[in-house]
Amino acid sequence: MTLLSLHRTLARKFRNTRVLRSGLTLTVIMAACLQGGCRTEQPWPLWDNYVKSAIDGQGRVIDHSAGDRTTSEGQAYAMFFALVANDRSHFDSLLSWTETNLAGGDLTLRLPAWSWGKAPDGSWKVLDPNPAADSDLWIAYDLLEAGRLWRDPRFEKLGNVLATRIAQQEVVLVPGLGTTLLSGAVGFHPDDSTWILNPSYLPPFILAHLAKVQPTGPWATVLDSLDPMLSDGSAGGFAMDWVTAGNSGIRPGLSPMQRTAINKLDAPFQGKLDTTPIGSYDAIRVYLWLGLADPATPGLHNLLSRVNGMAAYLKDHVTPPQIVDSAGRIVDTNAPPGFSAAVVPYLTAVGLKTQARVQMDRLSATRDASSGLYGKNGSYYDQNLALFATGWSEQRFRFDKEGKLNPKWE
């Protein structure tokens, strides 16, 4: 905003007050505005409706479809949306709740626990102290960009500390792959030759931004690991939820929970779908992140080509698949509306604008008039995917090639 346009804005805003009678007062106000103090919250109906339905007065994001639990993912995404909306009050409350309840009161000392909710004894507390690396990345990114955009050094410093801890505790060197992001600090390295990875945990724009902010860190090489993870760990051009990497190569894999289930099953049941690699609720975010990234993001063209199966499928089908198996076969076509939202930026990025409009139309057709949310139940995950996709489609935010956030209000 130029000084002239700022002066005109203030003149309109305060035309009926005495403030403009004092040139000194106006100068003070202008200075404050240039420091971010007069930027107003941007109207965003979907964000407002999501806040009403899922965020309590303390800043806790509640997943009503999962026993009212809270995850670090939900907190991280909501902090991002609050930043896009220039909603400082909700950002502050979300951060405060996260630090108090998921990080033992101090994010400088530990990574946040991923799951919080009602325990079997009826108490509300951390259910699993293990951190989730993708949520940790998002929170670090949110803090770094909030510090820059709102000119708050505390946020930037906290984001840097968090990113450094992620590099120490959740970044690993995997034979045959290189330096990459482990999905969590515990439970994802079951033996000396196996690492369990999740491609959707590596948004290219976040890694590109961390590489810029912390040039001596591992982030550029972590971003480089996404290409082989997708090229060797996908199936028929479809991203998988989980990838196994290590001495035996890179291939579609199982989550820790699936591996545990297999160990408990008798042999005749081990071919069941829930114990085989699939692409579904995690993998859908791979398409979303690639679509949101700036076209000039390092390596993006190759990354998009690794998951071209989704683009090919949607040339001839109205909705994305809900489940794809490890051979690239479509198992379930009943994708929720959030899946349609997630592929809109991706389809746009690969030049399929007509197909992108079809997915946006499908999403819009599922909007509930009373709640303003998408889908019959207004599910947590659908709303988050929709907030990312519609926020981008409505040009409320963009990422540049180095991952810097450019919100509409800036």
PLM region descriptions:
Residues 65-68, 80-84, 126-129, 149-151, ...:
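Second-shell loop/turn segments in exported
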Residues 79-84, 138-148, 205-209, 288-292, ...:
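Short glycine/serine- and small hydrophobic-enriched flexible loop segments
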Residues 23-33:
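Bacterial N-terminal signal peptides
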